[in-house]
């Protein structure tokens, strides 16, 4: 069995030998008991990719980005892969993964990012070549569905090179999607997999996948770990979306019984929004004219890298961010600014995770904030969206909690599972 987390920012692959799989817990939502069955060994699959011109190496994560090279930008040997790769987007000069991310942070207007968010955007033709968004006419374009397919095709090629006798298209493949993806977005995800040469797969909602992971890590001690908890909140904040799920916990014959009782609406709010906030802050410090779409995309990649450095252990106090010009202005048109660690903590914690009361609701505006054509949530405060979600599901939550619900108080989950890269920073 092969599990693929096709993320907005990164893609990761894990696998287990089904021959050692005696049994496994059924997904929450099917009224299943989290049975303590013998667990197979789970392995991460290091994904070979270009990490620099002419250099291929295996990495635990594949950045979910692609870069469309200009003619003559790199020599053919610099982008040669150790396998045959046919781009589903039919762009002859595309590179994927770490090298794509590195080039996109240096050259504006050629990076395709957040394809997963575009798959869920009903306001555009997701089969049309529209990415990179706002790029110049002479730059090759790709559709959101083809971009997503290209990451899966890259994984398939790397897998088949390592396991030629167990090709990926013949394995049991599970692909994760946000719980809030509608039927159209799920259908497009399946179509992207088909374009990548993976016609047979199952979709698994990301909060359920997080529960699977938790159950696996607490194998044999699930009852003890959950204690007397009766209501589990899964808060999954990824690169492009925030998924909120409520799961009722009931005593079972041998292990607790987990049933999904609430799913939040599709919320385009995650790490991308945080990077955009940082980019807009840096843009205001650069001086000069407002950045165009290509320059802002370049700045986003630099801010994402700076954010990760500034929130890591032993982080520096400040990190430089530079926006290069295009064409003949590549060096002469460069503009630089700095981001401080305190800047990042203040903008992200106070802006996206402020302390709020249980009665607060998201601030409504006329429409969602549109950047790069994507309809981001108008209110960036995840905690306010969480408060509204819990208020919406107050009745079922109170029933799930039973006598553990406090009289006269809003019902609150007594167990929380946090998932997503946002919660992994050392800060």
PLM region spans:
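Gly/Thr-rich phosphate-binding beta-strand-loop-beta motif of the actin/hexokinase/Hsp70
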Residues: 1-22, 219-260
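Phosphate-binding loop and its immediate beta->loop->alpha context
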Residues: 27-194, 205, 276-319, 330-368
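Conserved phosphate-binding/catalytic loops in two-lobed NTP-binding clefts
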Residues: 196-209, 375
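Conserved phosphate-binding catalytic cores of ATP/NTP-utilizing and phosphoryl-transfer enzymes
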Residues: 203-235, 394, 401-404
